[in-house]
């Protein structure tokens, strides 16, 4: 059943208003500040500023004190609309604001928000009506980091002032306590302590698995293989690098090239695959198919590479090279619902093994997409109907689908209450059409199959990172790299301890130390 996506509009509006309060405080404390942008985000807000000196942690209290002074004055937030030319005059001397204004149509009016009478900023709103409404909110500056103007490394490096903001001071304290606990569980910290993986300066974002990490990884893979064998999947493996022409046909070249690693071989451009699906399509296309073979479920533990900015990398949770537990299902239109139900059941079974709760989102057509309106409507309806028949609650996530089709996303909840998007089911009418895939139907005629893309772990590497933090390194016994440690209390017990370890435990394939 579709449920309304819960968004706390009041909190979002307050965070946005607090960003303006921060900007006003910074201008009062550091008049040479040039303001750029300052949006609300999931746990608070930030403001990017151009300031000659670097703000240090010693200055946080001073800035917060100034913010509280402004709030306690109870100044109103008021909107004013001005012409483009007037806005350019108001922000003369601030090249960041004037750049934004100059991108607007010449006849477009510009929205400003005033905080009191002496501070204004470019903004569409909305905001609280008065700063008084922010008096009970808990907020705290937690960091100042570098950020390129508009995220472009060719532009000037700015300072991004991050703040947490919550409805009450208790909510703020609870959030900070959760983050402190999360630091103790950080996959980078525990990965090193437990000798699971390492990241080398010679390969940022490319994880090295150590012996203990390989045990966890291989156990997850073994479980995946057995589960999929029982569910009627066949495993394939496709090349890691393929010709540019393939990516042009698939649409990745137009929609995903900026995330791809390229190379030239024999004067031809090749790309290291960022996704496994075109390879799976080529496997299907390599021979004729009858309707009697469908659905054809092809699984692949494929290594993919995607470019991520260095500042966004984080242990196993954000990497540039990872293994996706992919599967591509080729089917007839009449099989859509049953196949989606089967995949949902498989995903549910896996998450229950790890005692992980989840919620479901149905992500719809993004702006940067390919295919006809009719195909997108059919695909979206197919996913929605399957979820409704399963009586699953789900949230509509507008505009967050893949460029080739809508998708069902599964968001895991960990022991700290954080959520992680892992599993996904994508229904695709586009790739079968672009690659001219066919099967011979019961009527003896050629028909176009429909394709499902799906993952359960998402990326095995990221899933391991989530498990490390969820279990704080104390994996379930079946997954633990070290299941038993034999200790000898005195020297005279050494021989017996070795007998227990090497004879009894090894005979039962127990992982011991």
Question: Model-predicted segments: where are they?
Answer:
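A translation/RNA-centric and nucleic-acid-associated enzymatic feature enriched
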Residues: 267-269, 278-287, 296, 300, ...
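Auxiliary tRNA-acceptor-end handling modules of aminoacyl-tRNA synthetases
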Residues: 1-13, 25, 34-37, 46-308, ...
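Conserved small/polar residues in nucleotide/adenosyl-binding loops
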Residues: 503-510
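Extended, charged alpha-beta segments that form solvent-exposed binding/catalytic grooves
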Residues: 304-386
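Short, hydrophobic beta-strand segments
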Residues: 43-54, 158-163, 201-211, 323-333, ...
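Metal-assisted phosphate- and nucleotidyl-transfer catalytic regions
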Residues: 74-116, 252, 352-421, 425
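Glycine- and Gly-Pro-enriched alpha-helical subdomains that act as flexible
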Residues: 472-473, 478-481, 485-493
């Amino acid at each position: 059943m579709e449920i309304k996506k819960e968004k706390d509009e009041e909190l979002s509006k307050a965070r946005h208003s607090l960003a303006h309060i921060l900007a006003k405080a910074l201008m009062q404390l550091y008049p040479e500040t040039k303001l750029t942008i300052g949006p609300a985000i999931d746990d608070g807000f930030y403001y990017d500023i151009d300031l000659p000196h670097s703000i240090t942690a010693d200055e946080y209290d001073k800035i917060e004190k100034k913010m509280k002074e402004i709030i306690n004055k109870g100044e109103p937030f008021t909107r004013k609309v001005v012409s483009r030319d007037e806005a350019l005059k108001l922000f003369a001397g601030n090249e960041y604001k004037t750049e934004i204004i100059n991108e607007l149509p010449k006849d477009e009016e510009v929205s400003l928000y005033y905080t009191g009478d002496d501070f204004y900023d470019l903004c569409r709103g909305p905001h609280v009506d008065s700063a008084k409404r922010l008096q009970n909110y808990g907020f705290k500056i937690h960091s100042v980091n570098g950020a390129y103007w508009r995220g472009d490394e060719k532009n000037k490096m700015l300072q991004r002032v991050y703040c947490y903001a919550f409805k009450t001071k208790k909510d703020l304290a609870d959030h900070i306590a959760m983050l402190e606990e999360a630091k103790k569980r950080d996959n980078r910290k525990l990965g090193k302590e437990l000798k699971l993986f390492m990241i080398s300066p010679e390969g940022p974002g490319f994880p090295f698995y150590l012996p203990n990490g390989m045990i966890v990884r291989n156990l997850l893979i073994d479980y995946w293989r057995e589960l999929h064998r029982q569910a009627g999947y066949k495993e394939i493996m496709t090349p890691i690098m393929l010709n540019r022409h393939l990516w042009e046909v698939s649409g990745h070249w137009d929609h995903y090239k900026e995330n791809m690693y390229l190379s030239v071989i024999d004067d031809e451009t090749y790309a290291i695959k960022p996704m496994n699906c075109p390879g799976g399509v080529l496997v299907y296309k390599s021979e004729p198919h009858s309707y009697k073979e469908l659905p054809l479920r092809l699984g692949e533990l494929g290594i993919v590479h995607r470019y991520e900015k260095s500042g966004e990398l984080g242990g196993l949770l954000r990497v540039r090279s990872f293994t996706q537990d992919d599967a591509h299902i080729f089917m007839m239109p009449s099989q859509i619902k049953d196949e989606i139900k089967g995949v949902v059941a498989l995903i549910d079974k896996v998450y229950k093994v790890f005692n992980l709760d989840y919620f479901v989102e149905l992500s719809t057509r993004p702006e940067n997409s390919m295919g006809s309106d009719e195909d997108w409507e059919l695909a979206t309806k197919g996913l929605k109907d399957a979820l409704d028949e399963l009586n699953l609650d789900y949230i509509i996530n507008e505009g967050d689908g893949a460029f080739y089709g809508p998708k069902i996303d599964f968001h895991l909840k960990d022991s700290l209450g954080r959520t992680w998007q892992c599993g996904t089911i994508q229904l695709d009418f586009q790739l079968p059409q672009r690659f001219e895939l066919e099967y011979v139907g019961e009527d003896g005629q050629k028909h176009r199959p429909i394709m499902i893309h799906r993952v359960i772990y998402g990326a095995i590497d990221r899933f391991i990172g989530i498990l490390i933090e969820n279990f704080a390194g104390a994996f379930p016994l079946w997954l633990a790299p070290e299941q038993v440690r034999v200790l000898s209390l005195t020297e005279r017990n050494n021989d017996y301890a070795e007998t227990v370890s090497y004879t009894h435990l090894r005979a039962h394939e127990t992982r011991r130390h």
